[in-house]
Amino acid sequence: MENRSDFEADDYGDISWSNWSNWSTPAGVLFSAMSSVLSASNHTPLPDFGQELALSTSSFNHSQTLSTDLPAVGDVEDAAEDAAASMETGSFAFVVPWWRQVLWSILFGGMVIVATGGNLIVVWIVMTTKRMRTVTNYFIVNLSIADAMVSSLNVTFNYYYMLDSDWPFGEFYCKLSQFIAMLSICASVFTLMAISIDRYVAIIRPLQPRMSKRCNLAIAAVIWLASTLISCPMMIIYRTEEVPVRGLSNRTVCYPEWPDGPTNHSTMESLYNILIIILTYFLPIVSMTVTYSRVGIELWGSKTIGECTPRQVENVRSKRRVVKMMIVVVLIFAICWLPFHSYFIITSCYPAITEAPFIQELYLAIYWLAMSNSMYNPIIYCWMNSRFRYGFKMVFRWCLFVRVGTEPFSRRENLTSRYSCSGSPDHNRIKRNDTQKSILYTCPSSPKSHRISHSGTGRSATLRNSLPAESLSSGGSGGGGHRKRLSYQQEMQQRWSGPNSATAVTNSSSTANTTQLLS
């Protein structure tokens, strides 16, 4: 191997910083940025090897994997030898100053813990509580799974890769890590679009049948299937290569190798990345802006003719709360990823920007902001939804500063009253059957509606009012006894304290409700 202190431009093209700033390979800038900052902190010039070894992935890959920008397919060995030879002209210690290691460890470690733990708690709350198993919440579970995947299976390993500049996890996981990154972001974005469409249909066209659980699962399957197909190239183009470094042990790099040429010089890569940025950012943002704008006009801009029942009013308020929460989720997504995409579009048009002295630290901040999007959704759910908030309190009730309290009752069950007795002060409606007769008492002085039913085979009283959901529900038509219907609060307490505790809460609350009704 011929020792050369510098790469020849004729053989290897432009290996300057701007070459790594191409928007089609944004993550390629990250390790170069850290290398430049590292070199500047040691007051030593950055050798060519520091520019040759760089993170290079697709523009929406959610990852930062160290890789080599190879000159051409089949020249891997020559590029590695030339990179190693260039190390003879300077020293490049793959060591980040300790204070920067602490800083980035806090930022990335905190992000991984909050994103993974928070999203898994959201999944647990929905899947273990019957009252939370709604169409929108199932989509939220899908979104949480995708966010938990990228934070635990991709960010964690890439953070180690950033610090040590070595990929010790093997070639298979090099491929799998990039595949998971692309799969997760596609699934997240498509799920957000599905939620916006579901809210649009439910609010704009309320007479259409609501989405069934089977349809919900089918849509989730289509989302993951489409995301898998889009992410498949990651399993094909990524590979690992061992690169010798003078004075240090060999380093293994994980990099993309496109069939028609190296990264930054591949037409296939450019077309693929353009498709990805359209499908996973611009198209979803436009789609969700249109749907939520139409929904917002319907919920906040339209007026109802005539008087509304309290339940109708509360239904509108409930829909507004859900839409507000999802709009915040979409806004956070757009804000987190806008600087990321803007950076690479701008630097592709104006490469000179990449020579600015502050560009390295700026990119690190932009990258962390984009990756941190996965940790904000659980915080938003806990902040804007009382049931998710109660579920989080139950999980962290062992903390001294957490007070569980009582869960707000279901508003849909709280308001079962109807102001329908404007004609006469009192009226009774009696319905007789062979096995059952029911009497409905409606009183204008109270919004409460009491219904007492007696079965023919056995006697069981059911009192339904506008108070909590802890009221009793009658047993089957032929059973005789009665069974208690657990509220959301009781379901959560039963998960943590056992059935005896939930039964005690049910009995006490039911007795209180019955006393209040009869009084």
From Swiss-Prot:
InterPro entries, A to Z: GPCR_Rhodpsn, GPCR_Rhodpsn_7TM, Neurokn_rcpt
A GO molecular-function annotation: neuropeptide receptor activity
GO biological process terms, semicolon-separated: detection of chemical stimulus involved in sensory perception of smell; G protein-coupled receptor signaling pathway; negative regulation of synaptic transmission; neuropeptide signaling pathway; olfactory behavior; positive regulation of sensory perception of pain; tachykinin receptor signaling pathway
Cell compartments where the protein resides: Cell membrane
Membrane-crossing segments per the record: 101-123, 135-155, 176-197, 218-238, 271-292, 325-346, 362-384
SUPFAM superfamilies, sorted: Family A G protein-coupled receptor-like
Keyword terms of this UniProt record: Cell membrane, Disulfide bond, G-protein coupled receptor, Glycoprotein, Lipoprotein, Membrane, Palmitate, Receptor, Transducer, Transmembrane, Transmembrane helix
Membrane topology: Multi-pass membrane protein
GO cellular component term of the entry, any: plasma membrane
Tissues in which the UniProt entry reports expression: During late embryogenesis (stages 11-15), expressed in the brain and in a specific subset of neurons in each neuromere of the developing ventral ganglion. Expressed in the cortex of the adult brain, which contains the neuronal cell bodies.
Positions of region (Disordered): 444-519
Principal localisation: membrane
CDD domains reported for this sequence: 7tmA_TACR
Low complexity bias locations: 500-519
Lipidation (S-palmitoyl cysteine): 399
Glycosylated residues, chain numbering: 3, 19, 22, 61
Stretches of the chain found on the membrane's Cytoplasmic side: 124-134, 198-217, 293-324, 385-519
Ranges of the Extracellular topological domain: 1-100, 156-175, 239-270, 347-361
Polar residues bias locations: 454-465, 487-499
Disulfide bond sites: 174-254
Role this protein plays: Receptor for tachykinin-like peptides.
Recorded family membership: Belongs to the G-protein coupled receptor 1 family.
Name of the featured protein: Tachykinin-like peptides receptor 99D
Organism: Drosophila melanogaster (Fruit fly)
Lineage: Eukaryota, Metazoa, Ecdysozoa, Arthropoda, Hexapoda
